[in-house]
């Protein structure tokens, strides 16, 4: 397996939001992704790309400790958020997930009204402000207010797939995170809905740091400032493939002037 990855030397002027430091994630005895170093800048969109099974979603879930919910999953190395170790014993994973929200691959509205989809999480997190204002602001930020302002009492499941995904984004925004993780948020959507999500991402990065996993390389080009390319290779004695970070750089450099041949091969469609 390729043991090294390529990225620009750390820029002291970059405000690092999340720092992944020599992270290896295992399921039982199997190492799913190994030795990942990556500094995610604040206020930008970072895309994770790579073929299936390369560990990009595993790393994404580690950023807000969603992997804690998978039996047998363990982390070696460190993941720092604002300089603090997310996996330190005193850290509450529930609070981590509030500050680092997640939007999943399949839209998953709560079985509640559109209004309550937004208000529910804020309420249980102790929000004491104007709930109507919070609901409207969150729906506006997710670019769905105009489409649902007259049916807030209707079920979230009555919306189209693309609208449901934007509702889920609004639900995430409502608990006021600092980072939003998106795991293939457009994979189940049609091109028009995908475009709306991408336009929403461009607006959201004004207020949030965003990390998105995508198989759609053109989507990575359209929405991201930085791109991390992951790959996977078989290891002697292992039944599966181990993922690793090949290269992390400005999106323009990854797609137009990559420093690694594997990156060039992937972004040019030679494998994947």
From Swiss-Prot:
Annotated compartments: Cell inner membrane
CDD domains given in the database record: ABC_PstB_phosphate_transporter (cd03260)
Binding site for ATP: 50-57
Catalytic activity: phosphate(out) + ATP + H2O = ADP + 2 phosphate(in) + H(+)
Gene Ontology CC: one annotated term: plasma membrane
Topological type in the membrane: Peripheral membrane protein
Major subcellular site: membrane
Top-level taxon of the source organism: Bacteria
SMART domains in alphabetical order: AAA
Keyword Membrane: yes
One GO biological process term: phosphate ion transmembrane transport
Function field: Part of the ABC transporter complex PstSACB involved in phosphate import. Responsible for energy coupling to the transport system.
Description of how the protein assembles with itself and partners: The complex is composed of two ATP-binding proteins (PstB), two transmembrane proteins (PstC and PstA) and a solute-binding protein (PstS).
Protein name per Swiss-Prot or TrEMBL: Phosphate import ATP-binding protein PstB
High-level lineage: Bacteria, Bacillati, Cyanobacteriota, Cyanophyceae, Synechococcales
